UniProtKB/Swiss-Prot annotation:
Gene Ontology cellular-component terms listed: eukaryotic 43S preinitiation complex; eukaryotic 48S preinitiation complex; eukaryotic translation initiation factor 3 complex, eIF3m
Function of the protein: Component of the eukaryotic translation initiation factor 3 (eIF-3) complex, which is involved in protein synthesis of a specialized repertoire of mRNAs and, together with other initiation factors, stimulates binding of mRNA and methionyl-tRNAi to the 40S ribosome. The eIF-3 complex specifically targets and initiates translation of a subset of mRNAs involved in cell proliferation.
Main location, first listed in the record: cytoplasm
Keyword list, A-Z: Cytoplasm, Initiation factor, Protein biosynthesis
Protein name as it appears in the record: Eukaryotic translation initiation factor 3 subunit M
Organism the protein comes from: Aspergillus clavatus (strain ATCC 1007 / CBS 513.65 / DSM 816 / NCTC 3887 / NRRL 1 / QM 1276 / 107)
GO biological process, one term: formation of cytoplasmic translation initiation complex
Family per record: Belongs to the eIF-3 subunit M family.
């Protein structure tokens, strides 16, 4: 798969390699028709003289030689399997010496996009290997890479190899936007590439990526061409695949496209169905289908999708009622009624909706209810803003009540603390005064005896024995 830029190292002058390549082509042709080597011999002679005299080569003369070599190179797809890669690498090396390699590389890519007849089993792998080499010999901003990438995608689509597509997928995800900007493609070229990637992704079973690139292709259509037949066909394809896809629940990118809006006139029934999936519920869908059979919509693009559409709208309906539930609690009976399913199947549909990422919550079998933690709004207009405002007002009143309770408790705590401290201080002062007065009343004679019993002579100091520490 495409990687950092590489360089082909092939020894020999242009004239030597061109003559060698012409001989190889003649050998593959098995002498059918004129000899390619003889056709280019007269063109190579002046170039050979320039090489010998070390003069600047005449690139226009080289271009004339390359025109004949590239025109005859279609036969390389019939070369022996072990020689195909080296033969194409030699041709690519010669083409890089042209005045404008792009005019030759695009044709080489068309050859490689066709089957390699001598290797039905490994032909796609060989072609992808050669194309990858070509891609990596070009600078990142070289628009020739566009044709090479188209050929790589075409080979992968024809082979149906999911392994090859998975190898290319990281490059498409990480690098494709940068490549498109560097190559400065026009709307038509960008659309062609996105559709090619979508076809390859679908052939490999990656329907989500396929849908993404179909939408990107749709967005390349200019507003003044949104009503053309080509735009209408692409819009119908994008919308039908989005409606049928089990992974697409957000239709914002589709409704924003001018070509989709143009379906309001050209395919009004299909556009009405889009509006139901965007904002309405299962009730509206069933009323619509009763009046407008799916087989009659836009040439029957949804004729075989009745069950898939109904199941998908059940998930969307559950998301809607979960988002609008004022108490965030949905009884099983309410869900069963909205989804037109038995009560015993409610948990299955809730789990499917959670897996789709439309809601989050907890099932309570004891209470037979679904506790909604989060729900996706399918549309967000005045009604939804009003719901948000109402919930914010409820939360505000609840917080104000909590704040009032906290403030009252804080004031009560401070008041009681001050009161307790004051009482404790008063009790301490009263106890201290009472204790001192009682002592004086109880022991006046004892105090007098203590004063009289004190010796009149001063006391002699006591001898103190000093103990020396061991040395």
């Amino acid at each position: 798969m495409p990687a950092p830029t590489n360089t082909l190292l092939i020894e020999g002058t242009f004239t030597e390699l061109a003559d060698e390549f012409a001989q190889y082509i003649d050998a593959l042709r098995k002498n059918e028709g004129s000899s390619l080597q003889s056709e280019i011999s007269s063109l190579l002679e002046p170039l050979r003289q320039q090489e010998q005299s070390e003069e600047e080569p005449d690139r226009k003369q080289r271009d004339e030689v390359l025109k004949k070599l590239v025109a005859a190179a279609a036969v390389l797809n019939a070369a022996p399997e072990k020689e195909i890669i080296s033969a194409y690498n030699l041709l690519v090396h010669l083409v890089h010496q042209a005045s404008n390699p792009d005019m030759f590389l695009s044709r080489i890519c068309t050859y490689l996009a066709k089957p390699i007849t001598t290797s039905p089993q490994f032909g796609p792998t060989l072609a992808i290997s050669i194309l990858t080499t070509i891609f990596n010999t070009l600078t990142s901003s070289d628009s020739s890479r566009y044709h090479v990438l188209l050929a790589i995608v075409a080979v992968i689509r024809q082979s149906g190899s999911s392994y090859a597509f998975e190898a290319l997928k990281p490059q498409l995800t990480a690098q494709l936007p940068t490549w498109l900007a560097a190559w400065e493609l026009d709307e038509e070229e960008a659309q062609k590439l996105h559709l090619a990637v979508a076809d390859a992704a679908q052939a490999s079973g990656d329907f989500e990526l396929a849908q993404s690139h179909v939408v990107q292709a749709l967005q390349t259509i200019p507003a003044n061409e949104s009503s053309s037949k080509e735009a209408r066909d692409l819009a119908v394809r994008a919308l039908a695949s989005a409606l049928k896809s089990p992974a697409v629940f957000d239709f914002t990118s589709l409704t924003a496209a001018d070509a989709i809006q143009a379906l309001r006139t050209s395919d009004s029934s299909l556009f009405e169905l889009l509006e139901i999936f965007t904002a309405d519920t299962l009730d509206a869908y069933e009323d619509f289908v009763a009046a407008t059979p799916l087989a009659s919509i836009s040439g029957g693009v949804l004729a075989d999708a009745g069950e898939a559409l109904q199941n998908k709208l059940r998930l969307l309906t559950l998301a809607s009622i979960a988002a609008s539930a004022p108490s965030r609690s949905l009884p099983y009976a309410t869900i069963a009624s909205a989804l037109r399913v038995p009560t015993e199947d409610v948990e299955k549909w809730v789990i499917d909706t959670i897996r789709a990422g439309l809601v989050e919550g907890k099932l309570s079998q004891l209470r037979s209810e679904f506790l909604v933690h989060r729900a996706t709004y399918r549309v967000f207009g005045e009604k939804q803003w009003a719901e948000v405002q109402g919930r914010l007002m409820v939360w505000r009143r609840s917080l104000e009540n909590v704040l009032g309770v906290v403030r009252a408790e804080r004031e009560r705590f401070i008041r009681e603390s001050l009161q307790a401290a004051t009482e404790e201080a008063n009790q301490g002062k009263s106890g201290e005064k009472g204790g001192k007065g009682g002592d004086r009343r109880r022991n006046p004679q004892h105090q007098q005896q203590q004063q009289q019993s004190q010796p009149s002579q001063p006391q002699q100091p006591r001898e103190t024995e000093l103990v020396a520490g061991a040395e």
